[in-house]
Amino acid sequence: RQIYNNTKKPITFSDIGKPLEVRYNWEGVKKDIDVDESQKTLWRYRSVLPKVNNIISLGEGYTPLQQLAPDLYVKNETVNPTGSFKDRGMSLAVTLAKAQGVEEICLPSAGNAGISAAAYCKEAGIKCHVFLPETIPSEYKKATEKNSKNVYLSGKTISDAGKAMIKKKVNDWFDISTLKEPFRVEGKKTLGYEIAEQLGWRFPDVVVYETGGGTGLIGMWKAFVEIKSMGWVNDPLPRMVAAQSTGCAPVVKAFQERQRDTDFWENSDTVALGLNVPGPLGGAWILDILRESKGIAIMIDEQRLKALTEEFNNLTSINSSDEGGVVWGLSLIHI
C-alpha cells in the first residue's frame, strides 16, 4: 500500500500501476449528518468530499429516486447536465485538476464520459482531448465536439480508443481515464449518499448497477461504507450486483470462475455502449466489492436488451439508453 499526502499536484496511478483511493481520517469518529441543504447538487455532500475552494459545477447530482414498486426504486441520472451519471465524476475530477494547475486533459470514452469531460473542461477553461471508437453513433461525436475541438476516432471499442490515445498523448496531458485518477470515484460516490438520504437515511437491501468500468459501483460502495463508519446509518450494508450483457461480461465471467481479476473479453459487442469495456482497469476492485457485500454478477442476453430497454422506458418515461435494459432485466429476476 502506498500513501500520497500531496494533493497540490495531479495524482494518477500509484508507482506500481494500480488505482488510488481517496481515504479520509474518519476512523473511530462518529460524525453528525452534515449536508448542505441549500445545495441541490452533489456538492450538498461537500463535507465528505475533497476540500477545494473553486468548484467546477454545471448543476450535477441530486437526481430523482423514482419508486416503481413498493420495494423497487430507480435512480434517474438522465437529468444530469449532459444526460448521464458521468457528470458526477467529471465535476470532481475537473475541479481537482483545475486546482492542481492542469491545462490539458485526455481520456478515451465509449460516449457519455467524453461528452461530460468536454463540457466540464470548457467550463473550467481546460483543453480536452477525447478519443472515441470509430463505431460510435454520430450523435455522441457531435455532442462531444460541441464543447471540444479535439475529438479523435479509432478502433471499435474504448480499449482501442485508449491505445490510440497513448500513442498521441504528450507529457503535459493529464489522463482522467476511468480509475487513472482517484477523484471520479469521489464524484460517483455521491450516488450512494443521495440514495441513503432519499430513503430517509437508510440503505437499500440490494443495488443493481450496470457495470462497464465500474466506477459507479465502486463509488456507491465507498459511500455506504463511509456512511456506516460515521454512524449516519446503522442498517446492514447493501448487496452489490454487477449487471452486464452477454456481449461483454468480463466481470461476470471472473466472478463465476472465482478469479481475483478480470480477463480481457475478446470480440466484445453490445448495443449498451457504456458496457462495452472488455478490460476494466478496476476489475479486481469490483470483484472484491461483490464478494465483501455478498453480492453477485449476472449477465443479460444481448438479444433482449433493446426490448428490455423499451419496456423499461415505457414504464418509467425515463428515456434510458440500453444500459437501462440490463438493469431492468435483472430486476425482473428478483435477485
What residue ranges belong to the model's regions?
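PLP-dependent amino-acid enzyme catalytic core
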Residues: R1-I333
